[in-house]
Curated annotation (Swiss-Prot):
Belongs to the tetrahydrofolate dehydrogenase/cyclohydrolase family. PANTHER family: C-1-TETRAHYDROFOLATE SYNTHASE, CYTOPLASMIC (PTHR48099:SF5), C-1-TETRAHYDROFOLATE SYNTHASE, CYTOPLASMIC-RELATED (PTHR48099). The keyword Amino-acid biosynthesis applies. The gene is folD. This is Bifunctional protein FolD. It comes from Bacillus cereus (strain G9842).
Amino acid sequence: MVAVIIKGNEVAEKKRAQLTEEVVKLKEQGIVPGLAVILVGEDPASRSYVKGKEKGCEQVGIYSELIELPETITEERLLAEIDRLNGDDRINGILVQLPLPKHIEEKAIIERISPEKDVDGFHPISVGRMMTGQDTFLPCTPHGIVELVKETNLDISGKHVVVIGRSNIVGKPVGQLFLNENATVTYCHSKTQNMKELSKLADILIVAVGRPKMITADYIKEGAVVIDVGVNRLETGKLCGDVDFDNVLNVAGYITPVPKGVGPMTITMLLHNTVESAKRAGVVCK
């Protein structure tokens, strides 16, 4: 058996086409979705991510505003910029590109963003609403992962989901989203003693640890859905995931590649959240 490859780039493009149609309808009502991205410093990776977000906004018709601030900016000045954007009716979503310089407390910055504009889904209020199954902005990568699994037409309810990794950005929230879909969820992490045995029980395996090709065929239940969140660069310069793709391909039922798997879905779900925020606000732009 050779696994079906879940092409995240194709799923993302399909969803972006739907978003484009939604934005056209909103603009007919005088509503223009707007996203503000704050970039602090000159980190090349952060700048690359921001460019991808700007390109995505342009593609679907979202107004985007990039605020570039120096590495030396004070926390107070950054908080004041967020306050300004919180009060700007043209802006439906505020995203602060992470990581931030060491002298700025990330927690304070995230908590300053209005929950109504928290399109990253990182604010504690957003997290609390997600945990209790309320309507809220879902974190983009975990939301994208659930959407990719749904593309397989697998009924998630009752399935065993194993999440390898427990980061606040991917591991913890993605498990909660699957729990909200009535799956049974097991978390594995660096202190888990029987990871291989637990992994082999998974109908759906999510891997987000940042270790190249860590997961091999002997971790996989035959026919399982395998979602590889890792993005690692080998010495050759080639990108690879946390899953040994070629090794697992003949055991899994479905698998995401790296690149063109989970990555394209992250920005797409950010665009989705921004459009949803604009719908909720319903502010007509003059």
